[in-house]
A protein has these predicted regions:
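Receiver (REC) domain active-site loop signature in two-component systems and cognate sites
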Residues: 61
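Acidic, metal-coordinating helix/loop segments flanking the phosphotransfer/catalytic sites
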Residues: 36-54
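Active-site T/S-Asp motif of two-component receiver
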Residues: 57-58
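Two-component/phosphorelay signaling modules centered on CheY-like receiver
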Residues: 17-35, 103
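Non-catalytic signal-transmission and effector/linker regions of two-component phosphorelay proteins
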Residues: 1-11, 17-24, 45, 71, ...
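Alpha4 helix (beta4-alpha4-beta5 surface) of REC/receiver domains from two-component response regulators
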Residues: 68, 88-107, 113, 117
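Acidic catalytic/metal-coordinating carboxylates
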Residues: 38-39, 65-68
Length: 133
């Protein structure tokens, strides 16, 4: 399997600590730089969205859910790809994946290899000047 440059930065947002750690291990095995956040609020307050190449987020979280996070991200970084991992895909009814909001959806449980492929595709679609790898 091809390793990725360590300069690709992936933010992972989920209120489930075990899922955060599982995704961290998966992504670090492919040499991604991983930033973990236990809430959407924590990501938004971190100020690191501008330096992030892709966001992976749960949808159902307290205070700010994944859909509101998507809106906040795209208000400041419209081309930043967002990948949802969720047990509740029905919450996305009416939104068009891979449309102007640049998101993909994986239902929990998901296959790690499929998530890695989605991340690879997402960072390859970044404008050339935004690619770090």
């Amino acid at each position: 399997m091809t390793k990725h440059p360590p300069s690709y930065i992936i933010a992972v947002v989920d209120d489930d600590p075990s899922l955060l750690q599982s995704i961290r291990i998966l992504l670090e095995s492919q040499d991604y730089v991983v930033r973990l956040f236990a809430s959407a609020t924590a990501l938004l307050k971190s100020g690191c969205i501008a330096d992030t190449d892709c966001v992976i987020s749960d949808i159902t979280m307290p205070v700010i859910n994944g859909l509101d996070l998507l809106k906040a991200i795209h208000a400041s970084s419209p081309g930043l790809p967002v990948i949802f991992v969720t047990g509740h895909p029905e919450m996305l009814d009416g939104l068009a994946p891979d449309g102007p909001q640049h998101f993909r959806v994986f239902t929990k449980p998901f296959k790690g290899q499929e998530l890695l492929e989605a991340i690879r595709d997402a960072v390859q679609q970044l404008p050339t000047q935004e690619r770090r790898g």
